[in-house]
C-alpha cells in the first residue's frame, strides 16, 4: 500500500461525501482511505458505506479527543508507506495523487502540503476569509509562496 489517506471527522457527513467522491476520480489508486469519526453525534457511516465498493475504506469511531489525537489514531491503523492527512472539507482535484506520485519519483522528500483554495460554491464572505488566510501578506512563509524551507521539506502545493 503506497498511500494511507487519513480523514478525521466530526459531524460532517456532507463534506465526507464530497471528499470521497473526489477520491473516486483519482487515476492513481494504490491507496487506502481511513475515516476516523471523532465522537460525532451526526456520523458519516452511511456515506462511507456508499463508497465501500469504490474505494478501499476503513471506518473507525472513537470518543471525542480532537483532530490531533484523531489523526494519530488513523496513523496507528494505517498500512501505507506515506500518510496523507486531509480534513473532511477537502476536495481533491483529479490527478492529485498522481502528481504526488510523480514528484516523489522525481525527488525524495519527507513532508509536503498544499494551500487552501476556496470552493466554487463559497459565498463572497467565505472567499474573502479564505483569501485572507492564504494571502502572502497575511501568512507569508510556506503558505505565502516560499519555494522551499530546506532540502527535505516542500511547501504546501494544494489541499
Label the predicted regions.
Residues 62-78, 99:
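Glycine-rich, basic loop-to-helix element that forms the pyrophosphate-binding segment
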Residues 95-127, 131:
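Conserved donor NDP-sugar-binding/catalytic core segment of glycosyltransferases
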Residues 118, 141-159:
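A recurrent flexible, glycine/aromatic-enriched loop bordering the glycosyltransferase active site
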Residues 87-91:
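The conserved acidic donor/metal-binding loop of glycosyltransferases
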Residues 83:
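Short aromatic/hydrophobic "clamp" motif used to bind/position activated sugar donors
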Residues 9-17, 37, 41, 93-94:
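A structural helix-start
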Residues 20-61:
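Acidic donor-binding segment of Leloir-type glycosyltransferases
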